[in-house]
Amino acid sequence: LSSRPPGAASGYLVVGEGGVVREAGEAEVSAGTTVEVRDLFFNTPARGKFLKSPATEQGAILRVVTQLTLAHADVHVRLTANGRLVLNAPPARTPRERLGALYGFGLAAKLLEVSGESGGVRLLGVVAPPSVSRTHRDDIHLIVNGRTVRDTLLTQALIEAYRPLLPRDQFPLAVLVL
């Protein structure tokens, strides 16, 4: 883990191996924060046996990083795997901008902005028109107080709102921030 605030002369570096901190202190590092993970289960091979294929595990990591990226649109997020850039999302001012970096700006241009306030709760976000649907619920993103959440009740409410507009096996794409 390395981190340096913009404009600072130096940053901080922490290197851990096998649950032990090998190095920690001030260091010359790039601006921003970098988390690098290598050989995660080198000293616990039994854990490695439960891993799926590398592609499946990388997909799971990408889903988690995508959720974090949506929840923190003001942060530049870059994900590399095996030396290849998998995700690059510069800071964004709106959920639409962030989704553009993640899913493509052509899709982001089709999204509909939503907002509302009731009882002290404010909602804003973007939803896809019925012509842009998915065969899974993975692209329904709910962010509450800066954290991504999986909430069956909120997800089901969104799906029910779309029910008259989508076939039974199709789901909306949405980012809703509460």
Model-derived regions: residue spans:
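N-terminal phosphate-binding caps/lids of nucleotide- and nucleic-acid-binding domains
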Residues: 1-178
